[in-house]
Amino acid sequence: MGDDLFKEARKERDDFEELMNACDLAKMSVKNNEMVHGLETFGVNHGESSSENKPTEIMKVVAPTVEAYVGSSSSTTVTKPSGGAVDGIDQKEVRQDGTSVQKDDNGFIFYKCRFCGLTFNFMNTLRAHERIHDVSQPYVCGKCGESYEFACQLEYHAAQHSEIDGFKCDCGRTFFSYTEMLYHKHTDDPIELIGAPETTTVLVNKKKIIPVTEQDLPQPAFVTEGYEPKHPLRVYSDVRSKPYICEYCSKSYSDSRGLAYHMYSHRGEKQFNPRASRYMMGREGVGYTDSRSYYLFPRTSGYVSPRF
């Protein structure tokens, strides 16, 4: 029983491998645009004559021929060779700055140097390599032939060939940024007027402003009448144990934090305490009753014992 299962599994594996080989053959024939030339038969001897053994048929595909090609000289065009390609490269593109971009069958992109022909995997690596050729203006426009030192200058120049509407100055130059149009220089302009905005007249209502003195400002009642302390004045021993005393009601505290919370009562403000709200304490999953965030809230008059 075990041998039969093993043979059946091996047969299924062989059938699957044969199917995959046929799929690979079809892909290669479509890719290379060539016909399968034929089938080659051969015999395998296992101690017997070749005539007694049944020949096995296999498929053979002719390798693609290598043909050199030259891409189109026009910019932003993709050309493909008629037959095969050099080193598996089947696409070529020439950008506006003259950089040759090649793409192989596996989808990998290569950037070719314009001066020596070396290829690189990344554009930044190619730009760093082109500096060794000591070219002052390596970035050349593909439409008008003007060269620039930096790539950003070429990108700004390439916008002039597009249909983007810009800002035109009276001198005839067109700018694609209003700030550059406003601050660009003219040969006949004086130095002090370069970049200066046009002068405009602003009408100001010159109303006489009466100065306000300190006597005209209203004074609070506690400045003139004073406060009567709600608690009796502390003796020296109490002041030593609670040195932080309120200047309005003479109530003392042992630390500055307690005095700071007490000052809210004189400001007319009331600090929100979520533990004093039955609605907030009844909610679950908000973190107010969580032991980790319990001490984040002060223990004020609405203190509620924790539930954990």
Curated annotation (Swiss-Prot):
A Gene Ontology cellular-component term: myosin filament
Pfam families attached to this UniProt entry: zf-C2H2, zf-C2H2_4
The protein's name in its UniProt record: Zinc finger protein unc-98
PANTHER family per record: ZINC FINGER PROTEIN 200 (PTHR47772:SF1)
SMART domains cross-referenced by the UniProt entry: ZnF_C2H2
Any one biological process term the GO annotation gives: post-embryonic body morphogenesis
Compartments (UniProt record): Nucleus; Cytoplasm
Zn finger (C2H2-type) start-end: 111-133, 139-161, 166-186, 244-266
Organism: Caenorhabditis briggsae
Molecular function (Gene Ontology), one example: cytoskeletal protein binding
Comment field on protein domains: The N-terminal part (1-106) mediates the nuclear localization, while the fourth zinc finger is required for the localization to M-lines and dense bodies.
Function: Probable transcription factor. Required for muscle structure. Its dual subcellular localization suggests that it may function both as a muscle adhesion complex protein and as a transcription factor, or work together with transcription factors, to influence gene expression. Thought to act as a molecular bridge between unc-97 and mhc-a at the M-line of muscles, possibly in a signaling role.
Gene name of the encoded protein: unc-98
InterPro entries to which the protein is assigned, alphabetical: C2H2-ZF_domain-containing (IPR050636), Znf_C2H2_sf (IPR036236), Znf_C2H2_type (IPR013087)
Keyword annotations: Cytoplasm, Developmental protein, Differentiation, DNA-binding, Metal-binding, Muscle protein, Myogenesis, Nucleus, Repeat, Thick filament, Transcription, Transcription regulation, Zinc, Zinc-finger
